[in-house]
A protein has these predicted regions:
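Small-residue hinge/turn detector
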Residues: 100-101
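Conserved hydrophobic/aromatic packing and binding residues within compact polymer-binding modules
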Residues: 104-107
Length: 156
């Protein structure tokens, strides 16, 4: 079957796999890659690095990651509600592009009053731009190996 490149939904792991003969997958299709009864995927070739993505896969990656982030909104909201300092001078929230000290304090002060319910609530109360887009940017930085700390991805 055809060769496909996949993004895991939990740790944003990049995989290469073969598709069942006669099946055609499109970008954004969700497929099961677990041990038993895979319908679309016949064989997982293995994990790949960011630099091994095809140019077509790279073009789609941001949109695919953002969709995963939106689908896992409760998980990411929990991150904003519970994130702690990583070092005495650096808070996990500051590792997200676009969030510096000012936004970090707004997020922390607001979550102390009441935890955030969803991205919209976070965006309104902490007055930050699109949380899903900021998280997506962070995930892409981690995937491409640009960052020392990993908040959302597993090392290749």
């Amino acid at each position: 079957g055809a060769l496909v490149q996949l993004v895991g939904e939990e740790f944003f792991t990049l995989l290469e796999a073969t598709v069942r003969e006669g099946l055609i997958l499109k970008p954004y299709d969700r497929v099961y890659v677990g041990k038993d009864s895979r319908h679309e995927i016949t064989y997982i070739i293995g994990r790949i690095g960011f630099d091994e993505l095809t140019s077509a896969a790279r073009v789609e990656l941001q949109g695919v990651v953002e969709r995963i982030v939106l689908n896992r909104e409760p998980w990411f909201i929990n991150f904003f509600n519970t994130a702690q300092a990583i070092t005495p001078r650096m808070h996990a929230l500051e590792l997200i592009p676009g969030i510096g000290k000012k936004y970090m304090w707004q997020i922390l002060n607001q979550r102390e009053k009441t935890p955030y319910k969803n991205f919209e609530d976070l965006q309104k109360r902490a007055d930050i731009p699109s949380p899903a887009r900021l998280i997506t940017k962070r995930i892409l930085e981690e995937m491409s190996g640009e960052s020392k700390y990993r908040l959302f991805t597993r090392a290749p």
